[in-house]
C-alpha cells in the first residue's frame, strides 16, 4: 500500500537482525504519514502526502490507505457505473497479510465498499505490486539495515535511537524504537536537497475489535476472478 521512493537501502538485506528486532514484536496500531517531494530538472517541485492505518497483531498485519469518504464514494460510483468487466482496484481496499507456522504468507484484500475478500495467489503478487518480505511488512523496514547504519547521539524518545547512513549522494535516517519494534521516523533525502521522503508513525490504541474479525458476510473471491 505504501507508495514511496525509498532507496534500495530500505528495501532489502539478508543479514541477521536479532540484536534489534524481537521474534515476537508487541501488538501495535498506528497511523502512518508519508511525505514525498521531488524537484525535477525543470524546477517544478511535486509533493505527495498520504496516510494509512496500520495494525500488527501476532503474525497478522493490516494496512489501509486513508482515503476521504467523498473521494472514495466518487471513485466507486464511476467505477461501478462503467459497463463491462470490472477490475479490482487494490489501492482502494485494506491489505491483510498473515504468516503461518511454516513461514508461508497469505495475501488478501478486504474491500469494505463491495463486501469482498479477495485472495491473491503467489503467482499474481506482481499484479498488486506486493513483495513478500515479511520483515519489512511486520517491522515497516528490515531491521537488519540498522546494523549497516551509524547510531547517533541525538535526542530521541525513550527506548528509541536515531541511525544514519550516507551512501553516494543519498542520506537515510531512521528513528528506531526498540520498545515498539518499528521505526518511528524514516527520512531519506538526496544531499542536493532535490528529493526528500519522510515516513512518520503515530501510535494509536488497538481497536476493540480487530478489522479481520469483522469480515462476516464478505464474499470470498480470487484476484483472477477479475481478469479479462
Regions found by a protein language model. Give the residues of each.
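Short, exposed beta-strand/loop patches in secreted or surface proteins that constitute
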Residues: 51-56, 96-100, 147-156, 174-175
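A short, amphipathic edge element
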Residues: 46-48, 136-151, 194-197
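Non-transmembrane domains of secretory- and envelope-associated proteins
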Residues: 22-24, 146, 155-160, 167-172, ...
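An acidic-aromatic
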Residues: 45, 49-135
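N-terminal cleavable signal peptides for secretion/export
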Residues: 19-66, 70-72, 221-228
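N-terminal signal peptide c-region/cleavage motif recognized by signal peptidases
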Residues: 14-18
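Short, hydrophobic/aromatic-rich segments at coil-to-beta transitions
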Residues: 24-35, 59-64, 105-106, 155-164, ...
Amino acid at each position: 500500500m505504501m507508495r514511496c521512493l525509498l532507496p534500495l537501502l530500505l528495501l532489502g538485506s539478508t543479514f541477521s537482525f536479532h540484536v534489534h528486532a524481537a521474534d515476537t514484536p508487541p501488538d501495535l496500531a498506528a497511523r502512518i504519514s508519508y511525505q514525498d517531494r521531488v524537484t525535477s530538472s525543470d524546477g517544478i517541485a511535486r509533493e505527495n502526502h498520504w496516510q494509512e492505518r496500520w495494525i500488527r497483531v501476532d503474525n497478522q498485519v493490516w494496512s489501509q490507505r486513508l482515503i476521504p469518504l467523498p473521494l472514495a464514494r466518487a471513485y466507486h460510483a464511476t467505477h461501478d457505473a462503467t459497463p463491462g468487466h470490472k477490475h479490482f482496484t487494490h489501492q482502494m481496499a485494506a491489505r491483510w497479510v498473515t504468516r503461518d507456522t511454516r513461514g508461508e504468507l497469505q495475501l488478501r484484500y478486504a474491500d469494505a465498499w463491495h463486501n469482498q475478500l479477495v485472495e491473491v495467489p503467489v503467482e499474481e503478487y506482481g499484479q498488486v505490486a506486493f513483495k513478500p518480505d515479511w520483515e519489512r511488512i511486520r517491522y515497516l523496514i528490515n531491521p537488519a539495515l540498522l546494523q549497516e547504519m551509524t547510531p547517533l547521539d541525538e535526542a530521541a524518545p525513550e527506548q528509541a535511537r536515531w541511525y544514519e547512513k550516507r551512501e553516494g549522494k543519498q542520506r537515510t535516517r531512521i528513528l528506531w524504537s526498540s520498545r515498539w519494534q518499528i521505526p518511528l521516523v524514516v527520512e531519506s533525502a538526496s544531499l542536493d536537497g532535490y528529493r526528500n521522503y519522510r515516513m512518520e508513525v503515530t501510535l494509536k490504541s488497538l481497536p476493540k475489535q480487530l478489522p479481520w474479525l469483522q469480515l462476516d458476510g464478505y464474499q470470498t473471491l480470487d484476484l483472477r476472478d477479475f481478469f479479462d
